[in-house]
A protein has these predicted regions:
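Phosphate/ribose-phosphate-bearing ligand recognition and processing surfaces
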Residues: 18-103
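N-terminal beta-strand/alpha-helix entry module and adjacent surface
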Residues: 1-20
């Protein structure tokens, strides 16, 4: 599994109504890409009204990581439209998914 999180101010933001819809959106995008034989996929960070950026980042990364574990190898780049979104996703990745934790 390969996941990169980058800053891309021109990235669109995916919108969802709630956390469950956000997770389902990422699962569907990843599964569809794998079925189509894709090896690389660029995704945009998602936002939902009323969900703080840290929670949105956690929902996003959990959905991506758990789905990637069930699929053939797929390199994913997650594009964040601003520093706040990038920081939320990077912090969540470092806390929950990074294999080597900083000291």
């Amino acid at each position: 599994m390969h996941l990169s999180i980058i800053l891309n101010p021109r990235a669109d933001v995916l919108h969802a109504e709630n956390a469950a819809e956000m997770a389902a959106l990422y699962r569907r995008l990843l599964t569809d890409a794998a079925r189509a034989g894709e090896r690389e996929l660029m995704l945009s960070a998602a936002a939902a009204d009323g969900i703080p950026p840290a929670q949105a980042a956690h929902v996003t990364l959990h959905a991506i990581v758990e789905t990637l574990r069930t699929l053939p190898p797929l390199a994913v780049t997650l594009r964040c439209p601003d520093e706040k979104t990038l920081c939320a996703h990077t912090a969540d990745w470092n806390m929950f998914y990074q294999e080597e934790k900083p000291e």
